[in-house]
C-alpha cells in the first residue's frame, strides 16, 4: 500500500513534549541563581507533573503514545542501531527502538531528579541528595543531546523531518497506521493546569512589591517574606 502523510502523534503528546523541553531548559538555566529560585522550583514541579501525565498517557493515550507501542527489548535496539549504521534503517511509524530507551531513561532520571530536588528544597537528607539531584539533571542533559542527535540522524536517514512531525503530528506511513483523532480536550486541560500552576508563582512578585510599598508608606517594618525562596536547597 502506498505511503502518505498520516496523523501519528496526538495533540496531548505534542503539547507534553514541548512543555517538558521548556521546563527542563528553564530549570537547568535557573539552577544556580538564588534570585529566581521560585521560578526554578516551579519549573521543577512542572517537569515532574508533566512526567506524571506522560505515565498516565502512556496507558490511556492514542496508539503511538502508549508504552505498549514502543516496548522494545535489547535485541530490537541493537538491530535498529545496526540497520542505522548500515544506512538502511528500519522505518517505524511511532518511536523507534533506540528512541524508546531514551524516553524511558529520561522518565526515570526525571523522577529521581524531582524527588531528590523536592527533598533538598524541604531540608530533608543531606549533601548526597543535592549531588543526586544535580547528577541526574546533568545525565538528563546528556540524554537530551543524544535525543537531538538521534532526531537529526533519523531525519536524514528517513528523509523525514522528525522535529516538525512533533509539531504537526504527521509522519509518513500507511493510511491504516494513522490514529483516529488529536484529543484536543486533553491537550487544553493539560495547558490549563500548567497555566494555573504558574499563575500563582507569577503573582508573588507583584504581591510582595505591593506589600513592601505599603509598609514603606506607613513607615513600618519591612514585611517578612514567606516565599519558598528563603528556604535553603535547590529543586528541579
Residue ranges and their predicted role:
Residues 1-236:
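Membrane-embedded alpha-helical bundles that constitute the cytochrome b-like, heme-associated redox core
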Amino acid at each position: 500500500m502506498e505511503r502518505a502523510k498520516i496523523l501519528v502523534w496526538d495533540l496531548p503528546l505534542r503539547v507534553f513534549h514541548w512543555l517538558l523541553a521548556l521546563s527542563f531548559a528553564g530549570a537547568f538555566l535557573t539552577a544556580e541563581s538564588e534570585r529566581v529560585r521560585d521560578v526554578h522550583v516551579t519549573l521543577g514541579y512542572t517537569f515532574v507533573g508533566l512526567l506524571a501525565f506522560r505515565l498516565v498517557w502512556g496507558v490511556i493515550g492514542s496508539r503511538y503514545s502508549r508504552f505498549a507501542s514502543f516496548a522494545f527489548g535489547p535485541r530490537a535496539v541493537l538491530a535498529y542501531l545496526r540497520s542505522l549504521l548500515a544506512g538502511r534503517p528500519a522505518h517505524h511509524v511511532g518511536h523507534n527502538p533506540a528512541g524508546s530507551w531514551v524516553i524511558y531513561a529520561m522518565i526515570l532520571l526525571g523522577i529521581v531528579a524531582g524527588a531528590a530536588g523536592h527533598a533538598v528544597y524541604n531540608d530533608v537528607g543531606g549533601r548526597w541528595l543535592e549531588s543526586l539531584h544535580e547528577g541526574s539533571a546533568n545525565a538528563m542533559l546528556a540524554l537530551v543531546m543524544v535525543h537531538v542527535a538521534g532526531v537529526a540522524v533519523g531525519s536524514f536517514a528517513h528523509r523525514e523531518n522528525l522535529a516538525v512531525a512533533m509539531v504537526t503530528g504527521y509522519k509518513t506511513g500507511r493510511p491504516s497506521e494513522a490514529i483516529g483523532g488529536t484529543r484536543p480536550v486533553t491537550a487544553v486541560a493539560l495547558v490549563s493546569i500548567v497555566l494555573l500552576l504558574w499563575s500563582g508563582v507569577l503573582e508573588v512578585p507583584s504581591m510582595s512589591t505591593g506589600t513592601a510599598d505599603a509598609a514603606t508608606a506607613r513607615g513600618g517594618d519591612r514585611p517578612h517574606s514567606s516565599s519558598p525562596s528563603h528556604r535553603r536547597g535547590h529543586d528541579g
